[in-house]
């Protein structure tokens, strides 16, 4: 700040001396000239005579007054320009957007190339938690990157691949079809990574994932239940227009079942298979009131432990009329039917993935492989991602520096296809300080809006880096990216014709930095 002020003082002093010199020289020429006042003024304004004897200054009153007057006039002109409300920005009147240069990206780079997040061949983003801060600029950016590119634009191999090959983070990847695993799995192993795979496409080759391994209290139970109910719908992105009692009743029932397994059964029974075993008991009804064996279990629990979360949630579910409760049973049963598939039962009976290892300084990479032809099992991926975020945030918050020892990077290819992570718009705004970052990959703006509805803007705002691999043919995306590029001022030749005479002059107009069609070819 002090250096900047000194520079400003020196500039003002130099400008004042220049103005005084010019005024004094003009005063000398005026005094020495002969003739009328007009002739003497013309002589004083003769540039060739002014510079002919540049050091011929005079202490006489008129030249000195001319020098001081020149300083005052220059100062007055400066103040008028600055405070008149008309800011002059030559050739920027209609916009100052321009293409970035190497000098623009340089402050955001780490001195070690291996500690950057590569974005393009020439642009990267430092992984450093703290970047330079000056009086004019704050170069700190969160590590969230959002990518837009239509099918075939190379999102996987040109974005996810280069970020993986930096080997500077622990990685969690959504991997439609398993192509990233096939390409980079062995490379990561050769670099000392412990590679884990949750494979919903080829489940015989999958590590095991048990949501109960990461449940520690009722809060975790509520999160898992809500996530499952949300993502086990045919289209999780579709707003619920039916009576809320169906979804709320299903949620209460599922919370009761999860809580009973976790709090009332031995650790070896803590898995979704046990939940389904309880659910089956609802089918065995007896007596004129149609009671089920599950009713008896929770009635006994309520008598033994009145404050039990499981008993209370079951009581909320049981407040529904009999026909409504039976409809809730059928609805939840249909949603939970995937847990009756033998291969799903097998990979969810215990846990070998150990999500907590991602929060350590150990090198770990987790590939979540999902089929690209069906979304039937993506609810499990959505639950895993949410639990993973929870574990990482909890671990960071319990460290002295509230930061993970090793950056954890989520490379979420085809992000809309893994279901919905509840409250993701809140999550992405809070993970930066924990040394966590996301690369979200979409095909278009429309996909982002469809996935998270009114919250799409919040997610976009919390991604400081945006990478566009062409806009495809989606008009909404093309218009959006074109507006983001802004306008620049260009000079054009305007020709007029008047009474047979032709004249021309230059004018400045505002022009988009790139048209919608040009935006198709952008790699920014």
Task: Put a short name on every predicted segment.
Residues 170-174, 195-198, 437-442, 466-470, ...:
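Short hydrophobic alpha-helical runs that function as membrane-insertion/retention elements
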Residues 201-203, 444, 472:
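Short, solvent-exposed coil/turn elements at secondary-structure transition points
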């Amino acid at each position: 700040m002090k250096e900047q002020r000194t520079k400003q003082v020196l500039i003002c002093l130099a400008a004042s001396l220049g103005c005084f010199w010019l005024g004094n020289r003009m005063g000398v020429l005026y005094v020495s000239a002969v003739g009328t006042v007009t002739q003497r003024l013309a002589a004083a304004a003769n540039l060739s005579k002014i510079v002919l004897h540049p050091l011929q200054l005079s202490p006489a009153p008129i030249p000195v007054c001319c020098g001081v007057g020149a300083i005052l006039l220059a100062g007055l002109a400066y103040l008028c320009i600055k405070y008149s409300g008309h800011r002059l920005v030559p050739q920027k009147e209609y916009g100052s957007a321009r293409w970035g240069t190497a000098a623009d990206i340089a402050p955001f780079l780490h001195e070690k190339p291996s500690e950057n997040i590569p974005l393009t061949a020439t642009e990267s983003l430092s992984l450093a938690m703290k970047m330079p801060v000056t009086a004019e600029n704050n170069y700190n950016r969160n590590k969230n990157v959002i990518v837009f590119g239509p099918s075939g634009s190379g999102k996987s191999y040109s974005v996810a691949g280069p970020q993986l090959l930096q080997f500077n983070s622990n990685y969690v990847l959504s991997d439609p079809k398993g192509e990233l695993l096939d390409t980079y799995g062995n490379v990561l192993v050769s670099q000392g990574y412990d590679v884990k795979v949750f494979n919903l496409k080829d489940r015989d080759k999958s590590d095991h994932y048990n949501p109960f391994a990461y449940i520690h209290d009722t809060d975790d139970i509520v999160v898992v239940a809500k996530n499952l109910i949300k993502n086990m719908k045919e289209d999780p992105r579709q707003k619920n227009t039916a009576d809320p009692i169906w979804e709320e009743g299903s949620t209460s029932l599922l919370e009761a079942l999860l809580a009973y397994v976790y709090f009332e059964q031995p650790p070896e029974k803590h898995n979704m298979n046990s939940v389904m075993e309880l659910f089956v008991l609802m089918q065995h009804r007896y007596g004129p009131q149609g009671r089920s064996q599950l009713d008896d279990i929770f009635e006994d629990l309520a008598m033994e432990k009145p404050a039990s979360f499981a008993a209370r949630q079951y009581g909320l579910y049981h407040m529904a009329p009999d026909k409504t409760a039976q409809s809730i049973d059928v609805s939840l049963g249909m949603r939970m039917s995937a847990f009756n598939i033998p291969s799903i039962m097998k990979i969810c009976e215990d846990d070998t993935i150990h999500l907590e290892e991602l929060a350590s300084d150990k090198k770990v990479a987790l590939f979540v492989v999902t089929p690209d032809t069906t979304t039937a099992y993506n609810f499990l991926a959505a639950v895993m991602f949410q639990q993973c975020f929870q574990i990482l945030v909890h671990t960071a918050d319990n460290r002295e520096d509230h930061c993970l020892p090793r950056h954890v990077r989520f490379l979420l290819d085809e992000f809309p296809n893994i279901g919905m992570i509840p409250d993701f718009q809140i999550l992405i705004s809070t993970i930066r300080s924990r040394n966590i970052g996301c690369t979200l990959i979409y095909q278009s703006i429309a996909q982002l809006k469809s996935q998270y509805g009114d919250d799409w803007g919040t997610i976009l705002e919390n991604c400081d880096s945006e990478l566009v691999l062409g806009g495809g043919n989606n008009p909404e995306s093309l218009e959006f990216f074109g507006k983001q590029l802004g306008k620049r001022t260009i000079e054009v030749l305007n020709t007029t014709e008047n009474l047979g005479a032709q004249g021309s002059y230059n004018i400045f107009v505002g022009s988009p930095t790139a048209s919608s069609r040009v935006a198709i070819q952008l790699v920014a």
